[in-house]
Amino acid sequence: MEKKNKIAVLILILIVIVGLIYIWPMLNTQIPIDTATLGDTDTGTVVKNVYGNASAKNTIALITGIHPRETLSIDPEIKAAKEYVRDHPDVKIIHYDVRVTKDPEDYENGRYNGEHLVQDYVNDDVASSDADCVIISHSHIESYGEGFYVATPAMDSASVEISEKIQKTSDFNYYPKTGNETYKSTSAQLVSIPIAQSGHPTFVYEIPEDISEWDSTNKAKELFDMMVEFACN
């Protein structure tokens, strides 16, 4: 009987350990400290989440979902944001979660709807925020850009200076606007340029689509590290 009791106790301990292995990551992930719906229309929704310590001295703004087909730059990077603030109590991340519900799989319409949701509901909000920098997340096919990179469509001095530091100290590339071309990107005209003009260093962040979700999450954390070092006060 005593042997059976010991076996039962061991089994119970194993069950508890296995349960903790699955439950602990959920318990140990920082939940939003503040959530607000900024927009809810027939084209989609925009929800503002603030992750981390409200009094943190460093603030990063992250915009995901502007182009709904670029899924590798959405949920994996949201995961990165939550995990990052959990491990960095001096940082908070303002996350603008854009979810296009009308024609999300249509290349032209999905992009149009996402860009206008950001223009209508994110631009003014992030402009009035305490964000030290703004990251606009995208992913790209192999022929569009090279690897992981940041771009600065507004070519404002703050964004350019930070991007040059990122390029010099990491394996991230930097694609500046040369000044010889007319920038025709609608997302730049509607979103990244106006936000940069509001005084916030703004970065179009591009990742390749031939990577894993794990890679996407970890590279986003690397970028957050560099933003804290180079952009945050």
Which residues does each PLM region occupy?
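Structured catalytic-domain cores with a bias toward divalent-metal coordination
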Residues: 2-233
